[in-house]
């Protein structure tokens, strides 16, 4: 009778310790993505200051997101073999430098260099931070990924709001104030890095005990390609909102820049809520169901959006953000379970592709807007969620025994 009692204590202590780390890494994800989201939020200022067209705006997004995407799988592969606990703080230092450069960039080329620094910082941050979230999950991988992601989405929602009330009134040089946010994140990530360093050995042992799916390599590769296509459909649509929605509202409805930024904030807030809901729901009903609903299920609303009034545009974008954003946590955890023991590589690959698809999409949509109209862009993008039909070809890898308890 005495032996079960000591065994029960570690179970209660471990989750309490993990929640602190999960909260810290989620907060830093929020700070990182807040700083990332400042870039599209200040596009109207940059467009006026440097006399840019939509194609050049798209190139800014392309530069930032490609630098953020190309390094992520590489960072993930390296850290799978040899973890780098303090790379989190180093990555945020790159972001800090980029913000300071952007605040005083004398030319358009200097703007591109600055946003590249911000992108490199993000590419270093995401694979290792996702690994820390999984390590601190206590076996509740869906919940941990959801909490981690909702921090990022909350930051993405807050960035445009802060830009509307800080950068728009005070100009481009006020971007330097956001370097304070990056410094705070560096301090927190240094503490997280120390915790991570102390748990690396435990993490290595857990990786060797990873579950196997029993699915052939060919099917795993096919499933990964399908998941990437789902990320493509989701992220290209979302980047059409984050990069061009303010211009769409100003052009179609004649709203002010600040009002358009507030509409964008509402959309991003709905996306943050959807991200938080998606993880726990995926743990309960299965991640494939979440992917079905979050991508294909949003199709009727995206098809209606280009023809809606201002009021219904806001209603529809809230629904789209809430439903579509729930997909990414499910996709990442599903991919991690497809390839056990490769958390860094898988996280880097999918975060990287998410950024890369977004960057390429932003550039192409910018060119499309210049050659046609901003309204036409949203008519084209409205069909992207139809790619969600590919979810039917994903394998079933979520047996009922694969639960947090069994972990």
Describe the role of every protein-language-model region:
Residues 148-195:
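Helix-loop-helix hairpin linking two adjacent transmembrane segments in secondary transporters
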Residues 282-331:
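C-terminal transmembrane helical hairpin of 12-TM major facilitator-type secondary transporters
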């Amino acid at each position: 009778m005495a032996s079960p009692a000591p065994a029960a204590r570690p179970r209660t202590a471990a989750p309490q310790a993990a929640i602190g780390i999960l909260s810290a890494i989620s907060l830093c994800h929020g700070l990182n993505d807040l700083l990332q989201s400042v870039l599209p939020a200040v596009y109207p200022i940059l467009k006026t200051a440097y006399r840019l067209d939509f194609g050049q705006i798209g190139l800014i997004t392309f530069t930032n997101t490609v630098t953020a995407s190309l390094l992520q799988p590489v960072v993930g592969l390296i850290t799978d073999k040899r973890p780098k606990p303090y790379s989190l703080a180093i990555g945020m230092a790159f972001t800090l430098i980029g913000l300071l450069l952007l605040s005083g960039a004398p030319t358009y080329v200097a703007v591109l260099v600055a946003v590249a620094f911000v992108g490199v910082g993000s590419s270093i941050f995401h694979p290792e931070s996702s690994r820390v979230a999984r390590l601190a999950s206590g076996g509740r991988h869906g919940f941990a990924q959801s909490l981690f992601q909702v921090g990022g989405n909350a930051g993405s929602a807050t960035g445009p709001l802060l830009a509307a009330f800080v950068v728009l009134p005070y100009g481009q040089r006020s971007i330097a104030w956001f370097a304070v946010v990056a410094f705070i994140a560096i301090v927190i990530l240094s503490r997280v890095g120390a915790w991570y360093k102390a748990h690396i050995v435990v993490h290595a042992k857990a990786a060797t005990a990873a579950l196997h799916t029993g699915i052939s390599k060919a099917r795993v590769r096919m499933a990964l390609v399908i998941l990437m296509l789902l990320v493509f459909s989701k992220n290209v649509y979302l980047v059409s909102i984050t990069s061009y929605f303010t211009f769409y509202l100003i052009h179609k409805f004649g709203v002010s820049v600040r009002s358009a930024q507030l509409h964008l904030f509402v959309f991003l807030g709905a996306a943050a809520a959807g991200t938080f809901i998606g993880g726990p729901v995926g743990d309960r009903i299965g991640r494939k169901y979440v992917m079905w609903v979050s991508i294909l299920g949003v199709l009727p609303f995206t098809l209606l959006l280009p023809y809606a009034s201002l009021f219904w545009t806001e209603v529809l974008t809230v629904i789209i953000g809430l439903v579509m954003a729930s997909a990414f946590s499910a996709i990442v955890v599903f991919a991690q379970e497809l390839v056990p023991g490769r958390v860094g590589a898988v996280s880097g690959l999918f975060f990287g592709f998410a950024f890369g698809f977004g960057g390429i999409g932003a550039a192409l949509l910018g060119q499309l807007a210049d050659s046609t109209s901003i309204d036409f862009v949203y008519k084209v993008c409205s069909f992207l969620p139809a790619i969600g039909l590919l979810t039917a070809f994903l394998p079933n890898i979520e047996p009922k025994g694969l639960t947090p308890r069994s972990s």
